[in-house]
């Protein structure tokens, strides 16, 4: 089962300098070690590129840095249909991201939303937003 982890959030995570505490990389390494080829799609406002991240005792992870439209802390990746077609599972996070909704609608048989809402007693606006998306 080939898996693509899609991060629809507009912040640059540079795996060429550091992979420590990047959740997507940790999850991808764990899946690869269990026999599931896994790659990652990250947003960038710099040069588009593909970076290989080594995994001890397994094949490397490919991290695709691609441009996307950014609006209200949402990334919309255009023109990635050929990339998405290469994978059995599209695992996205942040169920309130518009691109997560798009993937779930366009590829319902292979989209998995890994992250859901977390109630926060300190953040009333976040709790209201969760109610809207629920």
Give the location of each predicted region.
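Short N-terminal targeting/anchoring amphipathic segment
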Residues: 80-98, 112-113
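A short, charged, and often flexible helix/loop element on the N-terminal side
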Residues: 54-81, 92-94
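A short, histidine- and acid-enriched strand-loop-helix "catalytic/donor-clamping" loop
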Residues: 10-12, 98, 111-128
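Short, charged/polar "capping" segments at the starts of alpha-helices
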Residues: 46-51, 121-123
């Amino acid at each position: 089962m080939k898996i693509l982890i899609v991060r629809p959030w507009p912040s640059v995570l540079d795996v060429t300098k550091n992979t420590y505490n990047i959740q997507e990389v940790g999850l991808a390494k764990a899946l690869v070690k269990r026999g599931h080829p896994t790659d990652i799609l990250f947003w960038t406002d710099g040069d588009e590129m593909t970076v290989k991240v080594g995994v001890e005792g397994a094949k490397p992870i490919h991290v695709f840095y691609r441009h996307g439209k950014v609006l209200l802390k949402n990334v919309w990746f255009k023109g990635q249909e050929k990339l998405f077609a290469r994978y059995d599972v599209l695992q996205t996070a942040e169920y309130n991201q518009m691109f997560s909704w798009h993937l779930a609608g366009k590829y319902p048989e292979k989209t998995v939303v890994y992250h859901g809402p977390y109630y926060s007693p300190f953040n009333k606006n976040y709790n209201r937003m969760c109610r809207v998306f629920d």
